[in-house]
Regions:
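Bacterial N-terminal signal peptides
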Residues: 10-19
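Hydrophobic beta-strand residues in large extracellular and virion-surface proteins
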Residues: 77-79, 105-107, 161, 173-175
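Interaction-surface and assembly-scaffold signal
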Residues: 138-260
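Positively charged n-region of N-terminal signal peptides that target proteins for export
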Residues: 1-5
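Hydrophobic, proline/glycine-rich low-complexity stretches
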Residues: 28-87, 237-258
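Aromatic- and glycine-enriched beta-alpha-beta binding-site module
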Residues: 86-162
Length: 260
């Protein structure tokens, strides 16, 4: 009986993924850029003020960042952990194993003409350097998530994210929080490689985000947080002067990727 129940659950999961993918494909003829991938994910993002010089060293020539107003030596940087539950190609077939876990670092920067872009400047991925050619190959890329809820109450969530690169850079997050009803935020954005800025990907996103706040703030729903960042590069960015500016949970995130 248990094996039969598991088989039914597996069939439902695959059927749901196929239906969502089919709905996404039906809209592709409306876009000029080639459609390359669809995914369903869960994400957790952290915003920081960090060492500006260490981040600027990772920017391409001619690009700059605006310093934090009340801390000129610092700039804003985001870390996003991703648990990609289902990843499909344009034919609806799994990309690789069909799932993946990794972490990316991104910044808002502008080129010499003053045009603003989101740049992916680093990360840790089991898939190697990735499409943006900036990720560090992972030796560990682990995600763990426990959800406890009763009836119609919102849930209590515990997460563990552990990312370790072959170079020795690492990020480990332990996070516990009380959920709220997330806000649905569909969007279309263009992301640019921090190494080869002529390479862009357009993301058509349907997501729901839950801003958890900052630990210790009166309106924060974060019960506990432990973050350890180390390694030859990351210890320069996170040199002890960093400040956490916000934590956001994205319990569901559906993305279509288009490449010009």
């Amino acid at each position: 009986m248990k094996a039969k129940k598991m088989a039914i659950v597996g069939m439902i999961t695959l059927t749901l993924a196929a239906l969502l993918w089919g709905a996404s494909v039906s809209a592709q003829t409306e876009r000029a850029d080639p459609y390359v991938e669809w995914s369903a994910e869960t994400r957790t993002s952290l915003g920081f003020r960090v060492n500006g010089d260490a981040v600027r060293a990772l920017l391409p020539t001619g690009w700059s960042m605006t310093p934090v107003a009340d801390s000129p030596s610092q700039v804003n940087l985001s870390i996003t952990f991703m648990d990609r539950h289902v990843v499909l190609d344009p034919q609806g077939q799994p990309v690789g194993t069909g799932s993946s876990r990794y972490m990316v670092m991104s910044v808002q920067a502008r080129d010499a003409d003053g045009n603003n872009s989101t740049l992916i400047i680093n990360g840790i991925s089991p898939e190697g350097i990735g499409s943006y050619e900036v990720y560090q190959p992972a030796v560990t890329a682990r995600a763990e998530r426990s959800i406890v809820g009763q009836a119609e109450q919102t849930s209590r969530v515990q997460e563990v994210w552990q990312m370790v690169s072959a170079s020795g850079d690492s990020v480990t997050l332990h996070l516990t929080y009380q959920q709220a009803i997330p806000i649905r935020r569909p969007s279309t954005i263009v992301i640019r490689s921090g190494k080869n800025t002529s390479f862009t990907r357009t993301y058509k996103i349907d997501q729901a985000t839950d801003a958890l706040g900052v630990p210790g703030a009166p309106d924060s729903r974060i019960e506990s947080i432990s973050l350890k960042i180390a390694g030859p590069l990351y210890s320069r960015i996170f040199d002890g002067s960093e400040a956490l500016t916000g934590v956001t949970s994205t319990p569901w995130y559906h993305r279509e990727i288009f490449i010009p």
